[in-house]
């Protein structure tokens, strides 16, 4: 991934965020909430698709229509429940249609055999 940071903009301010500190993005209509590894949350005036494009070819994967996660923060995958637990303890849904692609992403990054 060539991008090392993102400029997150909302109606009040713009903030430069190290992309490695982003745990996940969650869609909120035409806005997006970004959760960082220090547990801070930032609301951005861009939609989830915009962030998906900006983080393509990196460690991010769209696991559900509402969630884009940093796979480096995955600690547990609940196979039969279609859920993923992140290092913060937050459990994120895994779309049935994305499960195989998710495993392939983890494999391609060398995170699993």
Residue ranges and their predicted role:
Residues 52, 103-104:
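A cross-family signal for key residues in well-ordered alpha-helices
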Residues 1-87:
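Conserved binding/recognition cores within well-folded domains
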Residues 81-103:
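C-terminal structural segments of small proteins and small subunits
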Residues 1-4, 105-113:
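Inter-domain helical "communication" segments and dimerization helices
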């Amino acid at each position: 991934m060539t991008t090392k940071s993102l400029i997150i903009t909302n109606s009040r301010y713009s903030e430069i965020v190290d992309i490695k500190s982003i745990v996940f993005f969650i869609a909120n209509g035409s806005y997006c909430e970004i959760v960082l590894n220090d547990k801070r949350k930032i609301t951005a005036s861009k939609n989830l698709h915009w962030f998906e494009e900006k983080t393509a070819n990196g460690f991010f994967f769209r696991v559900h229509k509402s969630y884009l996660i940093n796979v480096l923060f995955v600690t547990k995958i609940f196979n039969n429940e279609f859920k993923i637990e992140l290092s913060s303890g937050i459990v994120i849904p895994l779309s049935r249609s994305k499960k195989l692609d998710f495993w392939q992403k983890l494999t391609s990054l060398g995170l699993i055999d």
